[in-house]
């Protein structure tokens, strides 16, 4: 059984297709940076594992959902999967990995300073860390699953506490993606106009998750129904890795120890 909410994007639900390929594109763009012993923090359903394995010497993944790591262990018996929350990275020795990948995770981490510090600790000298996260400049509504979101400057400043070699890039979309984004924005604004009590702003996260999940799924289904050909035709080829730009959908941080 797969674990799907609108926060854990499906590769099977058609209305999730644009976001699935946006998330998958990060792994495609990461390929040229991947080498040696690789650790993925927050592997989820294993969206990018097949891409990583083609470039890695060994692969270890950590995720807090034990059902996920157990299923991935059966699917990839030669790789190592650990069920654990983080940070800290328990039982991971200093300078253990050549490459670290953590996509769409840091926005969920309460102690993001410790998270970056731990990444620096477990990387080998010359090792690289690749981190993606939503660009708050392009976020349409508050996400109750996220502790925080970042501007590129905020993420750069956070990383610079422990890393000196930092490259900030971002995941950008072509005209098809812009059309989907604009349609999504119009739809979200209609929903927000109905929020006469401003629940988006004031409702605690644990309560806001309930209407957010329902309305987010409804919205994705609506976008799919209104333009099936657009939603289902989007692939990783419609995304690109670009230099830092406030219009990038996601931030893509490259760190070297």
Name each region found by the language model.
Residues 173-257:
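A C-terminal cap/extension of S-adenosyl-L-methionine-dependent methyltransferases
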Residues 1-93, 99-103, 115-116, 152, ...:
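Conserved N-terminal segment of class I S-adenosyl-L-methionine
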Residues 113-125:
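A short glycine-rich, Lys/Arg-flanked "PGG" loop and its adjoining helix->strand segment in the class I
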Residues 163-175:
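Conserved S-adenosyl-L-methionine
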Residues 139-157:
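Acceptor-substrate binding/catalytic loop of class I
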Residues 134-139, 149, 172-175:
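Short "lid" loop at the C-terminus of a central beta-strand within the Rossmann-like core
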Residues 127-133:
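Conserved beta-strand signature within the Rossmann-like core of class I S-adenosyl-L-methionine
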């Amino acid at each position: 059984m797969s674990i799907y909410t609108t926060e854990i994007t499906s590769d099977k639900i058609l209305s999730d297709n644009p976001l699935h390929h946006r998330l998958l594109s990060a792994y495609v763009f990461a390929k040229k940076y991947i080498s040696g012993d690789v650790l993925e923090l927050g592997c989820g359903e294993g969206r990018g594992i097949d891409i990583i394995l083609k470039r890695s010497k060994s692969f270890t993944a950590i995720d807090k959902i034990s059902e996920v790591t157990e299923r991935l262990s059966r699917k990839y018996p030669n790789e190592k999967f650990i069920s654990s929350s983080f940070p800290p990275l328990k039982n991971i020795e200093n300078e253990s990995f050549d490459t670290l990948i953590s996509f769409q995770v840091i926005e969920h981490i309460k102690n993001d300073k410790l998270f970056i510090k731990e990444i620096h600790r477990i990387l080998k000298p010359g090792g690289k860390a690749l981190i993606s996260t939503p660009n708050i400049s392009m976020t349409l509504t508050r996400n109750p699953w996220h502790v925080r979101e970042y501007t590129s400057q905020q993420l750069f400043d956070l990383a610079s506490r422990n890393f000196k070699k930092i490259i900030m890039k971002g995941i950008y979309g072509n005209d098809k993606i812009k059309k989907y984004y604009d349609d999504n924005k119009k739809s979200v604004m209609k929903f927000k106009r109905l929020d006469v009590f401003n629940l988006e702003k004031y409702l605690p996260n644990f309560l806001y998750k309930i209407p957010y999940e329902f309305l987010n799924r409804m919205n994705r289904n609506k976008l799919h129904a209104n333009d099936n050909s657009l939603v289902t035709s989007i692939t990783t080829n419609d995304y690109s890795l670009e230099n830092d730009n406030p219009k990038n959908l996601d931030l893509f941080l490259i760190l070297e120890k």
